[in-house]
Each structure stands twice: as C-alpha cells, then as structure tokens.
C-alpha cells in the first residue's frame, strides 16, 4: 500500500494508561491535551498536519481501522479529479455497510435533523464514488488545499456536527466530498 510520512496522535485527555503507552511509541508524533471534545481533537490534529510537508491529511477516530489498501484506494480516486477535496472510506460495522453521512442538508428548520437525505447502504454499494454533503470524521482523506482554503474544523462544536460543518464548508468552497466504495474501513 502507500507509505505514510507521519502519524500524528492527539490524546484527548485519556485517563486509562493511553498517555503512558503513547509516550513509549517513538514512531508517533503525539500531542497530549485535555479533553476538548472530538472537534477539538480533530482541530489540533489537522492544524499540526497542515503545517507539515504533505498533500493529504488522513483523519481517523479511535474506533475505526482501515483495510490494507484503504489509503491507496482513496488516493487513486482523489487524484482522478482535482475537485475532490475530501475522500471518505466505505465504513463497515460487523461486515455490513455503516452510514451516517448525508447526501443533502436541510438548514431551514432548527428543530429537525439537518441530515435531510441520508446516505443509504445501497448508494455506497452500487456506485464507485458517491457525492455527499455531510461526512463523518472517521477516515476522511482531506486535501491540504482544503485546509488552506477553509481553515480548521470548528472546535466549538465539541462532539456533534463538526464533521458535517467541515464537509459543507469544503463544498461551499467548490470541492467535492465523496465516499469511495472500495476504500474499506471497519468501525467498532
């Protein structure tokens, strides 16, 4: 598969021995911080990565595991179209397609879920690439140009809709956000 230049781990206030274990991993670039929510962790990790010499930033949460060729597959599709700013993996839970993304958003009613047109398993399974509006921070490959153009995730959102906000901002900036069917990632 593809060689990864650097792995950045943001330890978001773990108290279960994670800090000590991470401190013993010399091949990792580890950042320890207080728990500032998922959005604060992604904010810090993307901030750190965007200051490095890279073209793409691959984000993951602690409950997802990419298949061996996931990154290679994401890159292959992302490099085919310069408009792709974020390429997301096809997530599986217990061997079945897991979706939480949205194909459209409804921002007209603050009392309803903004994910108006949910991505269905059949959408992902029947198309090589599916355009989405709302993504999850569970494996997206983000073009560094996107970060330079739209900035960092909104850390004030703490744990909810930070990823949807980020992907929507990328789309408003003219990028495509897609799910790549053959880029597999397990979610636990």
Each model region followed by its residue ranges:
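Short beta-strand/loop segment that forms part of the nucleotide-sugar
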Residues: 5-13, 31-33
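A conserved acidic beta->alpha catalytic loop
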Residues: 11-20, 64
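Acidic donor-diphosphate engagement hotspot in glycosyltransferases and nucleotidyltransferases
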Residues: 18, 42, 69-71, 162
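Conserved donor nucleotide-binding strand/loop of the catalytic core
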Residues: 19-48
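Short beta-strand-to-loop acidic/aromatic patch adjacent to the donor-nucleotide binding site
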Residues: 54-63
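Conserved donor NDP-sugar-binding/catalytic core segment of glycosyltransferases
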Residues: 69-102
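A recurrent flexible, glycine/aromatic-enriched loop bordering the glycosyltransferase active site
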Residues: 122-142
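A short, conserved alpha-helix in the catalytic core of glycosyltransferases
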Residues: 140, 146-151, 156-183
């Amino acid at each position: 598969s593809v060689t990864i230049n650097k792995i950045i781990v943001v330890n978001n206030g773990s108290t279960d021995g994670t800090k000590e274990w991470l401190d013993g991993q010399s091949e990792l670039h580890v950042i320890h911080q207080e728990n500032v929510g998922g959005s604060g962790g992604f904010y810090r990790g993307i901030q750190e990565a965007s200051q490095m010499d890279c073209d793409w930033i691959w984000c993951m949460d602690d409950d997802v595991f990419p298949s061996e060729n996931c990154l290679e597959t994401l890159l292959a599709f992302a490099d085919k179209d310069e408009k792709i700013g974020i390429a997301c993996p096809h997530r599986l839970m217990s061997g079945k397609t897991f979706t939480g993304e949205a194909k459209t958003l409804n921002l007209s009613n603050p009392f309803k879920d903004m994910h108006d047109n949910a991505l269905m398993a059949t959408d992902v399974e029947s198309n090589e690439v599916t355009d989405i509006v709302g993504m999850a921070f569970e494996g997206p490959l983000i073009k560094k140009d996107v970060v330079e153009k739209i900035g960092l995730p909104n850390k004030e959102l703490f744990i909810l809709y930070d990823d949807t906000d980020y992907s929507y901002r990328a789309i408003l900036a003219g990028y495509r956000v897609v799910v790549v069917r053959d880029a597999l990632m397990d979610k636990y």
